[in-house]
């Protein structure tokens, strides 16, 4: 799957993600965003929740996205993003 296909699927399910998991916004980053992903690559997604990133929200969203996209998801919250990686991720991130 390329980045356009993934973004299209995520956009189609955005309302459900907001309703179920109280997502503020999602961004695609990493090898998939750069269209350099291999068949066994995970999909890197940066998420911001409205409110706390509870275990229920975080893991619920991760499992939902894995089922939806059929690939492992590396889900990173904006608050947990390491400061030294932030500029690189923000530069390549594609907002859903």
Language model features: what each stretch is:
Residues 1-25, 33-39, 50-96:
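Catalytic core of pol beta-like nucleotidyltransferases
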Residues 46-48:
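Short hydrophobic/aromatic beta-strand micro-patches
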Residues 28:
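Conserved histidines in hydrophobic membrane contexts and catalytic metal-binding motifs
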């Amino acid at each position: 799957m390329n980045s356009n296909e993934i973004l299209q699927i995520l956009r189609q399910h955005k309302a459900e993600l907001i309703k179920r998991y109280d997502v503020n916004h999602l961004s695609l980053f990493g090898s998939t965003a750069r269209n350099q992903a291999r068949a066994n690559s995970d999909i890197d997604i940066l998420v911001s929740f409205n409110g706390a990133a509870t275990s229920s929200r975080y893991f619920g969203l991760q499992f939902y996205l894995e089922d939806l996209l059929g690939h492992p998801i590396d889900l990173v919250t904006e608050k947990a993003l390491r400061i030294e990686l932030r500029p690189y991720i923000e530069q390549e991130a594609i907002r859903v």
